[in-house]
Amino acid sequence: MAASGMLISNPSNVCFRKPQFSCSLKPKATVSELGFLTSQLSGIQISPSPLFPIISKPISAPLKPSLQPVARRICPFTGKKSNKANRVSHSNHKTKRLQFVNLQYKRVWWEAGKRFVKLRLSTKALKTIEKNGLDAVAKKAGIDLRKE
């Protein structure tokens, strides 16, 4: 059995005293005082001050995902992307699979910029660049090579 209080005396003669609390549960402010307080605050107008300009930017930055984004398997020059195909077993059981584009990282000489540009492109786009030139293929695809 649990009881609140202090044990005074020996264990054979048990006596519990009531604990004395110093805080009272009575409200300190009366209704008239609260009414007076609200009447004082009723005339105050809260508006932006020239001393404290309104901050247009959010104070906290949005949370970013902890995982880094994976590079998409799409060729930026030709627009080629993965093909959905079926893997067919001997018993003709079909399961879905992806046939990825043959993307390669390649350093290509850019004649107009007089420098090498490192690109991730498909082997088909590489053949097209060798035939037509990097500027023509990039212009047709809408790619700005100055950023790369």
From Swiss-Prot:
Keywords: Chloroplast, Plastid, Ribonucleoprotein, Ribosomal protein, Transit peptide. InterPro entries: Ribosomal_bL28, Ribosomal_bL28/bL31-like_sf, Ribosomal_bL28_bact-type, Ribosomal_bL28_sf. PANTHER family: 39S RIBOSOMAL PROTEIN L28, MITOCHONDRIAL, LARGE RIBOSOMAL SUBUNIT PROTEIN BL28M. Its main location: plastid. Belongs to the bacterial ribosomal protein bL28 family. GO terms for biological process: translation. GO terms for molecular function: structural constituent of ribosome. Transmembrane segments: none annotated. Residues 1-71 form a transit peptide. It is found in: Plastid, Chloroplast. Component of the chloroplast ribosome (chloro-ribosome), a dedicated translation machinery responsible for the synthesis of chloroplast genome-encoded proteins, including proteins of the transcription and translation machinery and components of the photosynthetic apparatus. The keyword Cytoplasm does not apply. NCBIfam families: L28. This is Large ribosomal subunit protein bL28c. It holds the Pfam family Ribosomal_L28. GO terms for cellular component: chloroplast; ribonucleoprotein complex; ribosome. It comes from the Eukaryota. Component of the chloroplast large ribosomal subunit (LSU). Mature 70S chloroplast ribosomes of higher plants consist of a small (30S) and a large (50S) subunit. The 30S small subunit contains 1 molecule of ribosomal RNA (16S rRNA) and 24 different proteins. The 50S large subunit contains 3 rRNA molecules (23S, 5S and 4.5S rRNA) and 33 different proteins.
